């Protein structure tokens, strides 16, 4: 079926969402809707493609470039190494078969979260990630708890504010692209 995705920065689509039985995902400090940036979803690759984890690592490095503004090649290398480790601790490797448990694709509860990565980092990277784990942006440190299989999904980014809107936009664009 046809899927519709709407990014709503001004909460203009709430009434329409109710009329169309759309899912509204509100992202922000007071929200109870969470999207885990570490989720790997089965729909995220075409059938003939392989490499779920490699694809996800590239997307995560892009996301962390937003958080850290700029990273050295050494920082990117450290970050990639630690990302691989947090997935390995969840039993997920570059072998796509590790994403299946009892012949079903692993759920969001089987995926790492930001805190898992934070606990592996040291120094400057760890310090810069702290607000996303324990501070005002800790709503990004949760397992996904929203239904993503609706044909109409509205991403409410009203609460994010000017400084943090880039994180919400990235998360939703990646989610919708998948």
Regions found by a protein language model. Name each.
Residues 9-178:
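P-loop NTPase motor domains
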Residues 1:
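Glycine-rich phosphate-binding P-loop
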């Amino acid at each position: 079926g046809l899927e519709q995705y709407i990014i709503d920065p001004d909460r203009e689509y709430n009434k329409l969402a109710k009329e169309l039985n759309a899912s509204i995902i509100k992202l922000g400090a007071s929200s109870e809707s969470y999207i885990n940036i570490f989720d790997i979803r089965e729909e995220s690759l075409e059938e003939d493609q392989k490499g779920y984890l490699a694809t996800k690592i590239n997307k995560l490095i892009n996301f962390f470039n937003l958080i850290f503004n700029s990273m050295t090649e050494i920082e990117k290398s450290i970050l990639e190494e630690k990302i691989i480790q947090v997935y390995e601790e969840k039993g997920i490797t570059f072998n796509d078969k590790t994403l299946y448990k009892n012949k079903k694709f692993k759920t969001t509860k089987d995926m790492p979260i930001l805190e898992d990565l934070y606990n592996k980092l040291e120094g400057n990277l760890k310090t810069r990630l702290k607000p996303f784990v324990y501070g005002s942006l800790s709503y990004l440190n949760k397992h996904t708890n929203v239904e993503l299989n609706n044909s109409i999904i509205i991403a409410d980014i009203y609460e994010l504010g000017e400084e943090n809107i880039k994180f919400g936009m990235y998360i939703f664009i990646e989610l919708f692209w998948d």
